[in-house]
Regions:
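Single conserved hydrophobic/aromatic residue that forms the stacking wall/gate
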Residues: 1-7, 11
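Short, acidic (Asp/Glu-rich) active-site segment that either coordinates a divalent metal cofactor
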Residues: 53-83
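Conserved beta-strand residues within beta-sheet cores
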Residues: 31, 41-45, 120, 131-133, ...
Length: 182
């Protein structure tokens, strides 16, 4: 859950930074993508080593498609870059500075709360999946429902077709929109 919370926190920062630097409407596609105009703009990977009651480390790797103008055919329909969306090359240093500034501003809130509760409202405001029909590709039991938001520890809350609420852990599934990538 810590890795999920940390990743969610980093995504919120990326989205805030890109929005500040360029004024574009970037959104979070839970659990590990940031999207712009319905296409993937950023990706994140997390790795954690832990023991019972002790975390050795959490490593977060993130990437933003900044000035890429072409994508391989197999992802061309679902991927984009800032340069494509803006119509011109983008200053990478400006993006990095804005992302780091946004990260720093909210880092203390995250540490104080120990989870995403202090950031949950702002996170959900940029959550592309919120109130949208989704297909949860859980290998044990795939299902469809409506994404409601996240928990204070980063799980996606989904109202299933039978009315029950499922809390989906990021390491378990892939979430897709019913009608598109988002």
């Amino acid at each position: 859950l810590l890795a999920s919370s940390a990743a969610s926190d980093v995504y919120k920062r990326q989205v805030q930074g890109v929005q500040r630097a360029l004024g574009v409407d970037t959104r979070i596609k839970w659990p590990n993508d940031a999207v712009l105009n319905g296409k993937k703009l950023c990706g994140i990977l997390t790795e954690m080593s832990a023991q019972i009651d002790y975390i050795n480390y959490v490593v977060i790797g993130t990437g933003i498609n900044v000035n890429q103008t072409e994508f391989p055919e197999e992802i061309a329909e679902i991927a984009t870059s800032l340069a494509i969306e803006m119509g011109h090359p983008v200053n990478r240093a400006k993006i990095v500075a804005a992302v780091l500034e946004a990260f720093e501003e909210n880092y203390e809130k995250f540490l104080e709360a120990g989870d995403l509760s202090a950031l949950q409202e702002a996170y959900e405001a940029v959550l592309a999946n919120k109130d949208q029909p989704v297909r949860v590709l859980d290998p044990k039991e795939p299902f469809e429902g409506v994404a409601l938001g996240i928990t204070s520890t980063g799980e996606l809350r989904v109202r299933k077709e039978d009315g029950t609420i499922a809390e989906v852990h990021s390491g378990e599934v892939s979430v897709r929109g019913l009608y598109s990538y988002v």
